């Protein structure tokens, strides 16, 4: 479906149309939805938009049809205030039985060790029988597909949560990167507006998307108003690999 409409808002009409189109041909659909801090746009739905998305799902889940809504929250820990970024999740706790919400979580990103590729998958449902079935199916399919996540990542997460002081240290370190990304986000927005550069709506995370348009294609150069020194907030040697990558992208013209 088309993600944004002509007003640069989430395109609910296209979202609904494509779900209904698929469900006229078959009885079930799996929807993959990456938010908040969507990759690659950095878009986060507003509270009202989440309500509208849920309303569309319920409207489309007519009798005899099943919807699995896979919510990829990989970048939720870099989507602004941690508590506010999670406030939308309870909205999915009141779905009918024919709508199953599955949440994919990335410990690798949330705990700043990308290379270990550690994550988890859980479901949100009011029905204990559906939850039990999900656990059985997920356990069987994961063992048959990739067996398990990296042991080193699992061990690291377990160690962090056994030690309150270490956990607090991790949160503080991650907060530094959150603040770093937030400042870069604001700087890029200001520079883009100054240069007349159109972007897809974004407000958090690692990414921004510049759509191909007549307006943007006429731009021959985009020069951020901030200097390299203002972006250089710490030595590259002391920054995690993903932060170094973002720094390089931020300074590229």
What is each PLM-predicted segment?
Residues 1-253:
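PLP-dependent class I/II
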